C-alpha cells in the first residue's frame, strides 16, 4: 500500500461522511403514502367510471365506440333497447388488469358517460377482482359535466315521437327557413 492509496482512501472516506451528513438533514423525497396525500396533476387519468344524466338515468347508449377506441381491448359491452327506443348497455365490463388508462375511451364517448377519475388505488389480491361490471362502474352523479343530457342535446328521435316532441326537448330549427 502506497501513500497515494492511503490519501485516496482517506479522501473517499471524508467524501462519504460529507455526503451522509448532507443528506441526513435535507428534505426527504420519499412520501409516506397512506399517511401523506399524493399530489396528482389536474389532468391525471385514473379509474374509469360510468356517469348518469341529471335526471338519474344511465348516460351510456351502448354505441360501442369506447370498445373500438381502446388500444388494448379491455372494454366489452352488449347493447339492449328499452320500450321507448333508447339504447343502454345490457352489460358493461372493463378489465383493469389490461387497462393502460390512456383516456381514449373517454375521448370517444359521445355522451360523456365514461369519465376517468383521479382514483388510482386499484390493488387486488386476485386478478378476477380487477374485472369491473356495470354495477361497479356506475356512480350516482353526473361527473365532470353536470348539466349534459345526450338525448336532449343530440335531438335524436325516440320511437313513436318526432324530433322535438320528447320530454324537455326543444323543437328542431328549420335551417332552410333562416336563409335569405
Curated annotation (Swiss-Prot):
Binding site for [4Fe-4S] cluster 2: 70, 99, 102, 105
GN (gene name): nuoI
Keyword Chloroplast attached: no
Protein name listed in UniProt: NADH-quinone oxidoreductase subunit I
Keyword Nucleotide-binding part of the UniProt annotation: no
Keywords assigned by UniProt, alphabetized: 4Fe-4S, Cell inner membrane, Cell membrane, Iron, Iron-sulfur, Membrane, Metal-binding, NAD, Quinone, Repeat, Translocase, Ubiquinone
UniProt: [4Fe-4S] cluster 1 binding residues: 60, 63, 66, 109
Quaternary context: NDH-1 is composed of 13 different subunits. Subunits NuoA, H, J, K, L, M, N constitute the membrane sector of the complex.
SUPFAM superfamilies documented for this protein: 4Fe-4S ferredoxins
A Pfam family: Fer4_7
Localization, UniProt: Cell inner membrane
Segments forming domain 4Fe-4S ferredoxin-type: 48-80, 90-119
Enzyme class: translocase
Gene Ontology molecular function terms on file: 4 iron, 4 sulfur cluster binding; iron ion binding; NADH:ubiquinone reductase (non-electrogenic) activity; quinone binding
Catalytic activity: a quinone + NADH + 5 H(+)(in) = a quinol + NAD(+) + 4 H(+)(out)
Role played: NDH-1 shuttles electrons from NADH, via FMN and iron-sulfur (Fe-S) centers, to quinones in the respiratory chain. The immediate electron acceptor for the enzyme in this species is believed to be ubiquinone. Couples the redox reaction to proton translocation (for every two electrons transferred, four hydrogen ions are translocated across the cytoplasmic membrane), and thus conserves the redox energy in a proton gradient.
Obligatory cofactor(s): [4Fe-4S] cluster
Main location: membrane
Single biological process term from Gene Ontology: aerobic respiration
UniProt remark on cofactor binding: Binds 2 [4Fe-4S] clusters per subunit.
PANTHER family: NADH DEHYDROGENASE [UBIQUINONE] IRON-SULFUR PROTEIN 8, MITOCHONDRIAL, NADH DEHYDROGENASE UBIQUINONE IRON-SULFUR PROTEIN 8, MITOCHONDRIAL
Organism whose genome encodes this protein: Cronobacter sakazakii (strain ATCC BAA-894) (Enterobacter sakazakii)
Membrane topology: Peripheral membrane protein
Family that this chain belongs to: Belongs to the complex I 23 kDa subunit family.
Lineage: Bacteria, Pseudomonadati, Pseudomonadota, Gammaproteobacteria, Enterobacterales
Amino acid at each position: 500500500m502506497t501513500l497515494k492509496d492511503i490519501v485516496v482512501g482517506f479522501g473517499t472516506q471524508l467524501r462519504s461522511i460529507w455526503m451522509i451528513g448532507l443528506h441526513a438533514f435535507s428534505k426527504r423525497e420519499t412520501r409516506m403514502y397512506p399517511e401523506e396525500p399524493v399530489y396528482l396533476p389536474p389532468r391525471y387519468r385514473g379509474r374509469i367510471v360510468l356517469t348518469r344524466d341529471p335526471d338519474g338515468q344511465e348516460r351510456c347508449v351502448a354505441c360501442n365506440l369506447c370498445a373500438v377506441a381502446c388500444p388494448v381491448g379491455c372494454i366489452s359491452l352488449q347493447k339492449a333497447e328499452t320500450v321507448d327506443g333508447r339504447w343502454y348497455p345490457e352489460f358493461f365490463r372493463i378489465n383493469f388488469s389490461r387497462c393502460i388508462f390512456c383516456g381514449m375511451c373517454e375521448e370517444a364517448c359521445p355522451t360523456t358517460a365514461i369519465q376517468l377519475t383521479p382514483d388510482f388505488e386499484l390493488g387486488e389480491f386476485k386478478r378476477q377482482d380487477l374485472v369491473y361490471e356495470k354495477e361497479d362502474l356506475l356512480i350516482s352523479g353526473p361527473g365532470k359535466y353536470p348539466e349534459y343530457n345526450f338525448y336532449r342535446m343530440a335531438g335524436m328521435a325516440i320511437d313513436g315521437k318526432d324530433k322535438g316532441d320528447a320530454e324537455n326537448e326543444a323543437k328542431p330549427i328549420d335551417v332552410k327557413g333562416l336563409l335569405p
